Regions:
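Peripheral/terminal regions associated with large enzymatic or DNA-binding modules
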Residues: 1-96, 100-245
């Protein structure tokens, strides 16, 4: 299976620096194509410098750094680069962001899910986040009816047949009034998933922690804690438990 990691980056090098440190420690990174999509900003030079240092440190030979010629924004930036990666022939793509810390086994998790659930079209996405308790079992996976945008992955057939065509690219989807539960992530979670009976697979113990207290649409009040997150997780033999609603 041809797998890729998409990291979208904007103007927060103070978040990006520890996030790249975390990704540098991730096992199996060398097996994934990496695309870093950088939005233009006043600190784009500093951001690209951090990415270049990450590439030198990891020695990863399959990394492309794409500086968007114009700012695409939070709707278009992930869409454009996800679509490009699938069009280039990748079978499974994980999307990460510049303010999301990850565990060192996160790609082992995604590699397992990508293979195990490839033939289950109702599993639309794979997630790294969980709000589970601190003592959650790192090996356990569960199905969920909700979509979570904090480091997630999907397959090419799900993208081309469903997620791409239904992506909210202009805030035209909403619940009740414009601006309420709108955007691509809300659209997937509150409309696309329930209307089509779709779900996701996620770990009980989170493999991601959001450190982005300040962002395009983020405030400290928006952060959901991840008490089960650990930076270092031994290699697991993953297993699925019952469905979580």
């Amino acid at each position: 299976m041809n797998r890729a990691l998409l990291l979208t980056v904007f103007d927060r090098p103070h978040y990006l620096d520890p996030v790249l440190d975390a990704w540098a420690a991730v096992r199996g990174l060398a097996d994934w194509h990496v695309r870093v999509a950088v939005e233009p900003s006043d600190v784009a030079g500093e951001v690209v410098g951090l990415v270049d240092a990450f590439v030198r440190r990891t020695g990863h030979r399959d990394v492309e750094v794409v500086l968007n010629p114009t700012r695409l924004g939070v709707l278009e930036n992930p869409y454009v680069h996800l679509d490009a990666l699938f069009a280039a022939g990748h079978d499974f793509v994980v999307r990460a962001e510049d303010d999301l810390l990850v565990s060192d086994d996160v790609l082992e998790l995604f590699a397992h899910v990508a293979t195990t659930y490839a033939a289950e079209p109702t599993v639309a996405t794979a997630h790294a986040f969980s709000a589970g308790p601190a003592d959650a079992d790192h090996a356990e996976l569960a199905r969920t009816d909700a979509f979570c945008p904090w480091v997630w992955g999907t397959w090419r057939d799900r993208w081309t047949g469903l997620l791409g065509p239904t992506w909210d690219r202009d805030y035209s989807t909403f619940n009740g009034s414009p601006g309420f539960e709108t955007g691509w992530d809300w659209n997937l979670n509150t409309r696309v998933f329930p209307s089509r009976g779709l779900g996701a697979v996620a770990p009980l113990a989170s493999r991601v922690r959001n450190i982005g207290e300040v962002g395009e649409h983020g405030t400290p009040d928006d952060l959901v804690p991840a008490p089960s997150f650990a930076a270092h997780v031994p290699t697991q033999v993953f297993r699925e438990r019952g469905r979580v609603h």
